[in-house]
Amino acid sequence: MKFSTILAIPFAIAFANAAAAPAVTAAPAPAADNPYTIYPPVPKTASINGFADRIYDQIPKCAQECVKQSTSSTPCPYWDTGCLCVIPNFTGAVGNCVASKCRGADVTNFRKLAVGACAAAGVWDPYWIIPASVSSALDAAATATGN
């Protein structure tokens, strides 16, 4: 048997199997064991940014300016909540601002709202992804009193 014939046989088998496989023409069906087949709808508009719009009316006044951080240092579209929740350039700037301007329950309430907004956008646990140094600063601000 020729060497070229030996090489052609596996190729022919692989080609026949590929032809028999069903074509992929649609997104996979949702499955309980595959959370990546369903994402929440993302509105492509935002009055402030995708992160701030969801929580702005509920966040403490001391944090309202903080969520208006520019999204230009991120690869995210300004309206994409999920993306903004995981980019340290953005989350770190927001978190540091909140840590410097808010104290006590205001910090705790802000963190809960941020986590909730990010979870609703489909971000994985810990949802609002912030640098460790920012988390420490927020922890300190949450235990502090006064302004």
Curated annotation (Swiss-Prot):
Residues 34-145 form the CFEM domain. Disulfide bonds join C62-C102, C66-C97, C76-C83, C85-C118. The keyword Cytoplasm does not apply. Heme binds at D80. GO terms for molecular function: heme binding; metal ion binding. One of its GO terms (cellular component) is extracellular region. Induction: Expression is induced during hyphal growth, by ketoconazole, and nitric oxide. Expression is also regulated by RIM101, TSA1, HAP43 and BCR1. InterPro entries: Extracellular_membr_CFEM_dom. GO terms for biological process: heme transmembrane transport; intracellular iron ion homeostasis; single-species biofilm formation on inanimate substrate. Residues 1-20 form the signal peptide. The keyword Nucleus does not apply. Its main location: secreted. Keywords: Disulfide bond, Heme, Iron, Metal-binding, Secreted, Signal, Virulence. Changing D80H: Impairs the heme transfer within the CFEM proteins cascade. It is found in: Secreted. The CFEM domain is involved in heme-binding and contains 8 cysteines and is found in proteins from several pathogenic fungi, including both human and plant pathogens. The CFEM domain adopts a novel helical-basket fold that consists of six alpha-helices, and is uniquely stabilized by four disulfide bonds formed by its 8 signature cysteines. Secreted heme-binding protein involved in the utilization of iron from human hemoglobin during hyphal growth. May also play a role in non-hemoglobin iron utilization. Heme transfer occurs between PGA7, RBT5 and CSA2 supporting a model in which the 3 CFEM proteins cooperate in a heme-acquisition system and form a cross-cell wall heme-transfer cascade. The ability to acquire iron from host tissues is a major virulence factor of pathogenic microorganisms. Homodimer. The possibility of a transient honotrimer assembly of the holo protein is not ruled out. This is Secreted hemophore CSA2. It comes from Candida albicans (strain SC5314 / ATCC MYA-2876) (Yeast). The gene is CSA2.
